[in-house]
Curated annotation (Swiss-Prot):
Transmembrane segments: none annotated. One of its GO terms (cellular component) is cytosol. GO terms for biological process: ribosomal small subunit assembly; translation. The gene is rimP. It comes from Paraburkholderia xenovorans (strain LB400). This is Ribosome maturation factor RimP. It holds the Pfam family RimP_N. Its main location: cytoplasm. Keywords: Cytoplasm, Ribosome biogenesis. It is found in: Cytoplasm. Belongs to the RimP family.
Amino acid sequence: MQLTELIETTVVGLGYELVDLERTGRGMLCIYIDQPAGIAIEDCEKVTRQLQHVLTVENIDYERLEVSSPGLDRPLKKLADFERFAGSEVVITLKKPLDGRKSYRGILHAPQGETIGLEFEGKEGAAMLDFTLADMDKARLVPKVDFRSRKQ
C-alpha cells in the first residue's frame, strides 16, 4: 500500500478528510485534515497518535509527524471540495493562461459534471470562467476574517 493511500485510509477511518500530504527532504511528514465542523487541537492529537502506530507497524521511515488543519486559505483539490465550498470566494491559478491571464479571484459556482464555474470581475464587468480540474494548477479559499464582530 502506498503512503498516501495508507494515510488516507487511516484519516478517513477516524472520520476526517485528508486534504493534503507533504513529505519534506528532512523526513518531516505534514498531514492536513479537515471535517465540516472544523478541526480542533484534539482532532490533530487523535490523528497523530493513530498515524504514529500505523506508520510504525507499516515500517514507514519518518523523522517528525505534523498533523494540522489546512488553515483559512484551504487548498481545493478534489471535485468534492469545489462542491462543498460553492458560493465561497476563491483564487484559482490555471496551468495555461486564458486571454493572457492565469490567476482569477471570484465566487465559486457548484460544479456541473466535470466543469467548475468561477464568477469574477472582468474588464467589462462580471464574467464567468469555466474550467476543469485538469485546467487548474491550484485553487485556495480566500480567508474571511471579521475582527469587528468581537464582543466587548
